[in-house]
Amino acid sequence: MGGEVRVLLLLGLLHWVGGSEGRKTWRRRGQQPPQPPPPPPLPQRAEVEPGAGQPVESFPLDFTAVEGNMDSFMAQVKSLAQSLYPCSAQQLNEDLRLHLLLNTSVTCNDGSPAGYYLKESKGSRRWLLFLEGGWYCFNRENCDSRYSTMRRLMSSKDWPHTRTGTGILSSQPEENPHWWNANMVFIPYCSSDVWSGASPKSDKNEYAFMGSLIIQEVVRELLGKGLSGAKVLLLAGSSAGGTGVLLNVDRVAELLEELGYPSIQVRGLADSGWFLDNKQYRRSDCIDTINCAPTDAIRRGIRYWSGMVPERCQRQFKEGEEWNCFFGYKVYPTLRCPVFVVQWLFDEAQLTVDNVHLTGQPVQEGQWLYIQNLGRELRGTLKDVQASFAPACLSHEIIIRSYWTDVQVKGTSLPRALHCWDRSFHDSHKASKTPMKGCPFHLVDSCPWPHCNPSCPTIRDQFTGQEMNVAQFLMHMGFDVQTVAQQQGMEPSKLLGMLSNGN
């Protein structure tokens, strides 16, 4: 009983400071806050048992009242949450549990039922649906090879019964400060079609490609599990899942409207799925997924999968050119739903399909110039993206990594930028174009080479496993200090010092 009382006191404190969703109090700077009414008496045990009455709202906190001392306040909240955690741990199950779709006609590649992992949060009206990534296959030969080596990405037969959420799917406030209490849904990738397909397995088709239909069926099923009362649905994804967000976010919103739930705010979070249809560093034949140029692979894939793209984007291109909509900078301007784009400026998957390999032999000058140009090109495509987070790092995927809170752009972390974006909506479907003071959400690094941001994830030598600082990493790649210092108009010693400090 003592643990429950402490939990109620904590919730009362948070409610007074931040307010729950939909009941935020705004005032001009300097204006005295209204005095809070006296607290109601603590409810009896019977009134707080699960399922009784209306659920308590979740707490995406409004920090307007504590803007001057945010770090101290967050430290206190985290300390309270950690101290109370043992009191409630026995009642909480942090794992997401597997649910195979009841509609067994919506399947993985091999015809086994698709599904999702769910962790419900009865007090929250926010839902986070995450689309897993994992490349794709685009013809019978490389799909057969994929089935032999990566069957988990084509079949549900060996999926575990539970998963533990990490990063933005974590239920730990210290790892996931603003979404920890949301309803979490992890949708495994088993369609190999960048979440675009709509074709079942048949006598003619050895494999089903139903990625887009899987998303729709999961949403339909979740309506009966509490999604019908949602205020916000955030469709998130990494890599192929990030591209899947761009392809499906409007379709999810349209489905909810058709089913009678137009008030649910649908938003997107696309991580590491914003690819460029640029020329490869070295042209190669389109034989397998890794070596095939992005445009060639998607051209072939969209036919093989019977892939679907957003209707408004499709109208921008003539018949047979729908593949263009798989590239973020082309589909983004056509989307109705707001989308937050997270993209490393030097994405490892992009460099792989561009035939730039950064391991083994030192990088040649032509490769180095190609890499720098890639960063400039990608930065340019994000210029008009209202909400973005793009660190100058060599990496791939971030939002479900446990270190996702550590990376910063211009002094702001990704969770903080997402929270600022959340706050910009207030109670509307559209975000304010002007961020609140001290709360930015368009953050793109301006430094020109991989890992010039000191908060980038750790680099390790692939042979020794030893950590490398930025200077060591660039030297390992064959970085010519003299030449680059000359290009930048500075002394080589000064350049090395800047690199060692991560500037």
Swiss-Prot record:
Compositional bias per record (Pro residues), positions renumbered to this chain: 33-43
- Its transmembrane ranges are none
**InterPro entries, A to Z:** PAE/NOTUM (IPR004963)
Give me the reactions it catalyses: [Wnt protein]-O-(9Z)-hexadecenoyl-L-serine + H2O = [Wnt protein]-L-serine + (9Z)-hexadecenoate + H(+)
Which stretch is the leader sequence? 1-19
| Pfam families found in the cross-reference section | PAE
Annotated region Disordered: the residues are 23-53
Task: Locate the coiled-coil region(s) and give their ranges.
Answer: none
Q: Which GO terms describe its biological process?
A: bone development; negative regulation of canonical Wnt signaling pathway; negative regulation of Wnt signaling pathway; protein depalmitoleylation; regulation of bone mineralization; Wnt signaling pathway
Spell out where the chain is glycosylated: 103
Where are the Phosphoserine residues found in this chain?
88
Q: GO molecular function terms here?
A: lipase activity; palmitoleyl hydrolase activity; protein-containing complex destabilizing activity
Keywords from UniProt, A to Z, are: Glycoprotein, Hydrolase, Phosphoprotein, Secreted, Serine esterase, Signal, Wnt signaling pathway
Q: GO cellular component annotations, sorted alphabetically?
A: extracellular region
Q: List the disulfide bonds.
A: none
Query: Where would you find this protein in the cell?
Result: Secreted
Q: EC number(s)?
A: 3.1.1.98
**Catalytic residues per the record?**
239, 347, 396
EC primary class? hydrolase
Task: Let me know which tissues express this protein, per UniProt.
Answer: Widely expressed. Expressed in lung, ovary, kidney, liver and brain. Not detected in thymus, heart, spleen, stomach, skeletal muscle and bone marrow.
Protein role? Carboxylesterase that acts as a key negative regulator of the Wnt signaling pathway by specifically mediating depalmitoleoylation of WNT proteins. Serine palmitoleoylation of WNT proteins is required for efficient binding to frizzled receptors.
The Swiss-Prot or TrEMBL record describes its family as follows: Belongs to the pectinacetylesterase family. Notum subfamily.
Q: What name appears for this protein in its UniProt entry?
A: Palmitoleoyl-protein carboxylesterase NOTUM
